[in-house]
Every structure is written in C-alpha cells, then in structure tokens.
Amino acid sequence: MGSEMCIRDRLILTVLQECIDDYLACKGEKKPSIPVLDFLSTPVEELRTRAEEISSQLKSLSFPVSIVETLSRTGGGTMPRAEIPSIALEITPVGSSLEKLARILRGGDPAIVGYVSGDKFLLNLRTVFPSQDQSIVNALLETLQ
C-alpha cells in the first residue's frame, strides 16, 4: 500500500506540474482564468471597492454591516502556509444569536458561507467571485430584512 500511495502522489504532482507549466507558458497571450489564482491575486483595494459597493446597498438592514481588514489563509485547513491581506463584510446580529444568523445565511439560496470571529459574522470577499456580489446583496436583503 505504501508504494501505491507514492505512485499516486507522483502522478498528482506530475499533473499539477504540467498544468502550471502550461499556464506559465502563455507568455504574451491571455492566460486562462484559474479561479484560485484570481482569488489570490486580487488587490486589496479592489476588494475594498467591492465591499463599499455591497455595503452601500445594505444600508436598509436592521443589522449593522461594516467593512474590516482581515487575513485570508492559504494551504490546508489546519496547516495554513501563508496569510494574505483581505477585506471582509462584518455583520453584527441584532435581536438574534450569532449562531442563528450564520445558520440562516448558510441555509439560504444562495447559501452565504462566512465565518464567526468574536461576536461578529464575517464574509471574506477574497473568497467571493465579483459576479456573485449582487446575489449576496439580494440574499442579505431578503434574509435579514
């Protein structure tokens, strides 16, 4: 079983290396969009601009929404390899528990999956496609009104 694992690991590494080589070989051409690279390379100011636009559309909510600086972590869950500055929307529940707010947002359509930090719910925009911004606004307005 040990040698089978090494062979599978080598195969995975070889395929990954080929993908990266193909991507890097696109000199002068428009590189294909790779979502994770798009997420990692988005400038913080672009995230802030998106957050300001989203936040401006949420002023009617009874829940305070603010924009905060945060960190995104890359790598495997328990062993993050790097931290990248990011921007998050911070939602403070009013008249509702934090757990209930998170559960309602996760159960919505579309599901909004953020994380809890202290007594706030955060939605890190580095993990959201720009094309999803309006869907998030609509879902938050519908869910939290």
Model regions: which residues?
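Generic secondary-structure signature for well-ordered alpha-helical cores
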Residues: 3, 18-28, 52, 56-63, ...
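Structural motif of enzymes handling amino- and sulfur-group chemistry
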Residues: 8-58, 70-71, 80
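Conserved C-terminal alpha-helix-loop-beta "cap" of PLP-dependent enzymes
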Residues: 48-131, 135-136
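Short, small-residue-biased leader/transition segments that mark boundaries at the very start
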Residues: 1-7
